[in-house]
Amino acid sequence: MILRSTEALKRLDGFDMPELDSRFLVITASNIIGNNEINIMGTKMPLLASDFIAYKGQPLLVLFGPDYENTELALEKIKVKTSPLDYKEDTSDFPDPLFFSWGLDENGENDEERQQMKKVESSFELESGDEESFNRFPILSWQDSNGMMHVECPSQWQSMVKACVASALNRSQETITLHPDKYSGKYDEYLIGPAMYASFTSIATLITGMPCEMRESGIATRPGISFHTVTWIDKNGKPRHEETTVVIDQGYWAIMGKEVQRQIMVNILPKYSLESFKAMIRTQKSSKRPSIFCGSMVHAAALSSRGIHTSRLALKLDLTPSSFILDTNKDATRFTDWAPRHDLTDLEEKVRKISEESDFDRKWSSSSLHSGQFGLQGYLYGIGLSSGLSTAGFSTTTAKENQFMAQLSYTTKKNVTVSGYFPQTLSGDRSIKEILGRTFSSTDQTELVLFIEGTQKAPDSGPDILSTYSSIFLTQLMKATMKLSQLAKKEDAELPITLRFNSQNLALPCEFEYSGFGTAVVEVEVPKTSLIPEVKNVWIDTAIALPQVKGIDTKIKSIALVAFESLGVKLANNFNISVKYSSERKDVGTYSSVENLVRSLVTSALASAIWQATGQKSGVKMPYGDKAIERYLGGDE
């Protein structure tokens, strides 16, 4: 069991230990056999705190015992000795601010013309926090007679488990065998934790010579992100200039900090014409648990800021958000370093259809009858609309820096073996089998496709985050499968044939590529008694590119419900959700990330609905609750 800190930014002076017999094993930073660190794409963090405590909840000590009950009782008797720390903040390992702009050279930033325009401001904040899985999962390590260390655990990043265990034991990765368990995760709770826990059990196994197990909850840490956007509108009601400032709080260590900045940048780009645009994204350090993407919440936060700002602009111009989108959006997005030009015609058509289906314009215009001094009902009312494009996977820069690979082989038995580290989800291999079966014209995909996972020589196919395996990975797999099929059909082909391929797309012209799009409308009521938002109706309409769409409507509903749960809102007793989807196959470069798209759409629409219901001057904070609404209704922003 792990003893975690209850303080932050303190000097760690040691521990007051109870008397423990030979049945117990204590692991601290001082007796870790190898390296006391975990390396996540260049960001190094200690497995256990050694001389100082960086954040509340940081692992300090691990205790193994004969059973869980006695171990827990013994752990409660261990006291942590700390003292004040002369702390000087060091941000040398944090990324520099990310800037992007156009039109500033021609238009300036504070010219006289801008001073005469109307100014519209909005803000949105996704507060940092932890999402902990309800059930504890087991992590088991044992060593065989040949000295091979075996690890059994669920993981969204299997190769990192092996790398971390090898580092902690001061061994090569060839001496570590991973046995991945299947998992079902809502967020990224199996991304980093299993690598740390597997290191602890492996150290204990090496010291005791016995199999060692621990059970821990998966924890996904959500980054805190705040947005502030200002748009200047001319006398004709046209947006002319815009500035956006984003501040990210990833905790004490900024895991993949540059990539998080890039993921946000591509999602805050406006779709309407502007003479000038300026964005600045900076990452600040704090004494909080380090965070990463947390189930696409980075995407969702960026699109939410855009959705709230669209509502603010529409209100200023006496339009509904849907009318504003249809009146001001360009025919296509602007080509930038972040994403290519993308036609918006189909997206605007979905905005038009979902507005009609949900009766959005009428409900938006009449919402004041339920709020403020005109509110005669026992609740506040709001309705929000969002529209957006889907991006998935890592940026081109990150893909080039890491070169994640996978391997296909066509064997002498006419089987196709797939080698790499693949997500052990309950349906993780379904799409892979379908692609291979279709290409090799096999009706029995069970006989055709064999998975070889976690072996000593398996290539590192990267982490299962940002829906990589349902987006870029499948596109790369299709290309490799076609090439392997052509090689296998040659008359002089010598079997087996082995082919390695990138699991990320390194050839994109921009950092990201759009794939799939959608719209959502969320209708909320805020009872004046509880002040906790209740989602009443949801409409979702998406166009997605997937190898197979069986059961996709159920998946979309599930993603939406998980998003609402994580944002601190309830479902009304008469809750209803309507889902529509169509297949988009217009020469897309990647498959769609359904998770990114749906979570972002419903989060954005929900934030806009709550903003309207509570009558905010600028924006909202999420996750939401009664205290936040009371603060806003009281005028304290």
Identify the role of each PLM range:
Residues 1-349, 353-358, 362-637:
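Cofactor-binding beta-sheet edge motifs in enzyme active sites
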